[in-house]
Amino acid sequence: ETGVKVVETAGNNPAKWLPQLQDAGVKVIHKCTSVRHSLKAQDIGCDAVSVDGFECGGHPGEDDIPNFILLPRAADELEIPFVASGGMADARSLVASLAMGAEGMNMGTRFIATKEAPVHENVKQAILAASELDTRLVMRPLRNTERVLTNEAVERLLEKEKAMGADLK
């Protein structure tokens, strides 16, 4: 009804939504952080996958496989189209993604810093000022890893994770 042509799913198996979406003419791209998950998405009928390397902001999965390894493997094993995701920022990212077999690329964090994004200017400036050394991985002990821009709260969380060790559940 609203004209949505493509939906990206992530985090859980999208099988229960596929019939309704595809019957409505919507293409389903499932975000995957491993080739094994990408193959599962292909097997259940997803139209494409977004292969998300360890470089990504947000949830990089638990396998820690960067795009220079992940994308060629996906190209070798998948029969459905895939786009590269994770750490993508500009034309160089696109050229590299295409060279590794992707049909295109997906940028997430990069768009937070655009003038169109409804995000506070301080957040945009923090992203623009950040270097490759300014992110941290949190929630690893819970196997729900997230890559986040570091700040004092993140550093406190990491200290708490370290202090709690095996007691963190």
Model-derived features with residue positions:
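Active-site entrance/lid segments in N-terminal catalytic domains of soluble metabolic enzymes
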Residues: 1-78
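Conserved active-site-proximal phosphate/metal-binding subdomains
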Residues: 61-83, 89-169
